[in-house]
Amino acid sequence: MQLLLALLALAYVAPSTEDSHWCYEIQAKEPNSHCSGPEQWTGDCKKNQQSPINIVTSKTKLNPSLTPFTFVGYDQKKKWEVKNNQHSVEMSLGEDIYIFGGDLPTQYKAIQLHLHWSEESNKGSEHSIDGKHFAMEMHVVHKKMTTGDKVQDSDSKDKIAVLAFMVEVGNEVNEGFQPLVEALSRLSKPFTNSTVSESCLQDMLPEKKKLSAYFRYQGSLTTPGCDETVIWTVFEEPIKIHKDQFLEFSKKLYYDQEQKLNMKDNVRPLQPLGNRQVFRSHASGRLLSLPLPTLLVPTLTCLVASFLH
């Protein structure tokens, strides 16, 4: 009987991640922290098709079916609702914004976008490309639509499509990002809401002609419950924002109501790729990531053959 009571007590004090408050490593390390950092995330977070990953471009496989996307409603101007959700800044989307193409099985409706960042320009992205991390990473989250324009609620492997954009620090102000940056001061505390001045999603992204180069793999949400239901598209062309715009995120936003812990390093550690394959679109410009001899040998062979002829 005593053993049974001890086991029940242990089960009570060790709830799953879904039942307790999850957090990032920077929060879990705080004195008197009672939240579960990434190492303690449970459930699907312990499975083997998790995200984010490091994309090794030389090991990606060309997939001719990865054609350019069609973006519908991305040019729609609106005063979008934004909030501090205690883990990131989140912008609600929808209102006839959706994507198709890119070898997706059907249309996917935009639900929200959010970002991950550090206060250092090489630590804020969740994914990395050839070992390189970026200042930030923006996720535009879409859900699969069924007949009648309804969002699918099943647990299929392709339930969610996330478009991931790396964000790089540059010397010019990104006017498309500025409405969101200006709203940050109104979102300092968790669970606060505001709206951005009239803007459109398209203005936050790289030029449309540069969006045909991307990587694709099957993965998961990067936060609990880490559902393995995500088709990931990681674009090669980064978004560029000014350093001052970048720093506003870690200066203005806080994890806590007391505003003691600045929101930064909201990044899940890289997960093993395992036996998954990462694909690349035909437009991907990663040829130069190949070893130099691999590039030079065919070229020199052609030149010698031409000379002998």
Swiss-Prot record:
Residues 20-282 form the Alpha-carbonic anhydrase domain. Residues 282-309 form a propeptide. Inhibited by acetazolamide. Keywords: Cell membrane, Disulfide bond, Glycoprotein, GPI-anchor, Lipoprotein, Lyase, Membrane, Metal-binding, Signal, Zinc. Transmembrane segments: none annotated. One of its GO terms (molecular function) is zinc ion binding. Glycans are attached at residue 193. Substrate binds at residues 222-223. CDD domains: alpha_CA_IV_XV_like. It is an enzyme of class 4 (lyase). The keyword Zinc applies. It is a lipid-anchor; GPI-anchor. It catalyses: hydrogencarbonate + H(+) = CO2 + H2O. GO terms for biological process: bicarbonate transport; response to steroid hormone; response to xenobiotic stimulus. Disulfide bonds join 23-35, 45-226. Its main location: membrane. Residues 1-17 form the signal peptide. GO terms for cellular component: apical plasma membrane; brush border membrane; cell surface; endoplasmic reticulum-Golgi intermediate compartment; external side of plasma membrane; extracellular exosome; Golgi apparatus; membrane. Its EC number is 4.2.1.1. Its cofactor is Zn(2+). It is found in: Cell membrane. The active site is at residue 87. Catalyzes the reversible hydration of carbon dioxide into bicarbonate and protons and thus is essential to maintaining intracellular and extracellular pH. May stimulate the sodium/bicarbonate transporter activity of SLC4A4 that acts in pH homeostasis. It is essential for acid overload removal from the retina and retina epithelium, and acid release in the choriocapillaris in the choroid. Interacts with SLC4A4. This is Carbonic anhydrase 4.
